[in-house]
Every structure is written in structure tokens, then in C-alpha cells.
Amino acid sequence: MAAIPSSGSLVATHDYYRRRLGSSSSSSSGGSAEYPGDAVLQSPGLPKADPGHWWASFFFGKSTLPFMTTVLESPERSAESPQVSRSPMTCGLTPETMKQQPVIHSGQTNPRDLS
């Protein structure tokens, strides 16, 4: 049988979650009769329906987040396998820059290292 520490940390955790779950039924000031000094502060600019993600509106504003939307496949592409590019990644280099850079394979020496 596991020993429960008598330091009070388990009681403090229980009280925290009990206050957190009971905060929806507290008075308009944010406090409660059971815990008069514990007021849950609510910013006037934040929606009350989603208090757990206040940081999303802080960083991203009120716009919708396109990267969090559901991605749907089109019917004509659902039967195909995903397309994989066989070309090397250029990392934003222009074709002119790619022509100037020599391709060095393993086992070859770099002409720039010789000078």
C-alpha cells in the first residue's frame, strides 16, 4: 500500500481543484463564501465561455485560426497515394544560385577546399 504524505500537499491539491470546479457557481465578484480570499480574476476583454484558452486571443486576436481547421481530402485525390516530390529541396534558392553551386557527392573533394 502506498503511503500518503502528511505534508498537506494532497489536501492543497484537492482544495485547488474543488475551488476550480466550484468557481462557476461562485458569486459575481469571483469569490465564494467557502474561500473568501480566493477570487478568480476575469479580464473584461476575454470571453467567459472559454477561460482556459485566454492566451489564444492574446496571441492571435479574435480572428479564426486557419491552421486549426479540419483538412478534408477531395474525392478525386482520396484514392491516390500522397504525391511526393522527387526534386531536391532548394530552400528558397533561385535557379541562378543553384547553377552556381557545384554538386559534390561523397568521395569527391571540394574544389574550394584546394585553394
UniProtKB/Swiss-Prot annotation:
<feature type="region of interest" description="Disordered">
    <location>
        <begin position="21"/>
        <end position="46"/>
    </location>
</feature>
<keyword id="KW-0221">Differentiation</keyword>
<feature type="compositionally biased region" description="Polar residues">
    <location>
        <begin position="106"/>
        <end position="115"/>
    </location>
</feature>
<feature type="modified residue" description="Phosphoserine">
    <location>
        <position position="9"/>
    </location>
</feature>
<dbReference type="InterPro" id="IPR026754">
    <property type="entry name" value="PPDPF"/>
</dbReference>
<comment type="function">
    <text>Probable regulator of exocrine pancreas development.</text>
</comment>
<keyword id="KW-0597">Phosphoprotein</keyword>
<dbReference type="GO" id="GO:0031929">
    <property type="term" value="P:TOR signaling"/>
</dbReference>
<dbReference type="GO" id="GO:0038202">
    <property type="term" value="P:TORC1 signaling"/>
</dbReference>
<dbReference type="GO" id="GO:0001889">
    <property type="term" value="P:liver development"/>
</dbReference>
<protein>
    <recommendedName>
        <fullName>Pancreatic progenitor cell differentiation and proliferation factor</fullName>
    </recommendedName>
</protein>
<keyword id="KW-0217">Developmental protein</keyword>
<dbReference type="GO" id="GO:0030154">
    <property type="term" value="P:cell differentiation"/>
</dbReference>
<comment type="similarity">
    <text>Belongs to the PPDPF family.</text>
</comment>
<feature type="region of interest" description="Disordered">
    <location>
        <begin position="73"/>
        <end position="115"/>
    </location>
</feature>
<dbReference type="Pfam" id="PF15060">
    <property type="entry name" value="PPDFL"/>
</dbReference>
<feature type="compositionally biased region" description="Low complexity">
    <location>
        <begin position="22"/>
        <end position="32"/>
    </location>
</feature>
